[in-house]
């Protein structure tokens, strides 16, 4: 036995598992960017990162607030007096003032139409940690969750890798803007049951830049209520909605429906997308189930948010004037950036999935595929990464059922970089069309030449045939079958 094999025997199955999801093109694109990152002056030919759903559009507002409120940080002269209180061990339930500030912020980000209890707010290390925590609370290894496609590429890691939970895709179609239908849910649920898979719940997220309307949400709640399975709503893009229909939380739906088993309803939230603070690693599990809240709180000790971060954000999120202005601005700025990018694509003849929220669009490049297969999608994606030098995410990495869709993020860069990205896409599209037209012209010319050649050959045959006939009739040298010479 080789040394490597012996060493592997000493490791866990998890350590040797390939189920983390790193093999996905979603992560490969990030590596391409990391190896050759674009910079306007130092590396203008580098790869532009458009595979990262990050909100950098309102960081100036946060910076300005920090300047005006230096006492909010324990690392400033104005806030140093609180250093000892914050630096010591804190209960992993989280600072009370922080949980209250988060609950209030969640209410305001949802238009003040719902109320959240601070005691149900459980901290976690980003939405990644929150999603995994809720899986540990709701399912055992081998159990499964229904997840409509396309879905967030990293769900394969967040939901499955350490928990052993299975994902059952619910296939949705572009024919209705990838909306979730009851028929698709019932079909996926029935197939899972027929194969002996235990379905524990349904997870809905937003990888498309769309928001769910009231009717769809009511249908989903009715579905899980009838099946008595859980509903986990990933609401991390709540404040990025910029057009109708506005964002509707599942919390709003269940307070309006006549009968709902609230123990089955859970929300995942974070400050990464709405506030543009992914580096702060603030995730939230909000559950209406007391047992889940208790379990999630105990598990939160494995992924705490630092007390320094909690203290700082508690101060900022408690400033209602700042929060109200921030929420208005983030919606305006996302709308402006979305319009800028989609309008630029439209001028090239590229359409996108109709969207009203999020930090990205689903770009339709089906017309640029060699054929309608995922192999062709991957071939096109490699060209975009290596030649166009833009990192976008192919639909297959989001388990999209149709090849040719690409998720492109537009809020993680400045406007100048976005314009450079649009120029690169334009050059690529124009070049692709020119090549196709050239190939088409060559094919047409070849067809015309072949047609001319065949026509010439046909006429030549007719001409030769005619000449032979005339020669047969007129030539004195031609010996007739009845010639006495032949008979002799």
UniProtKB/Swiss-Prot annotation:
It holds the Pfam family Aminotran_1_2. The modification N6-(pyridoxal phosphate)lysine is found at residue 273. This is 1-aminocyclopropane-1-carboxylate synthase-like protein 1. GO terms for biological process: biosynthetic process. It comes from the Eukaryota. The gene is ACS1. It comes from Arabidopsis thaliana. PROSITE patterns: AA_TRANSFER_CLASS_1. Expressed in young leaves and flowers. Not expressed in roots. CDD domains: AAT_like. Homodimer. Keywords: Pyridoxal phosphate.
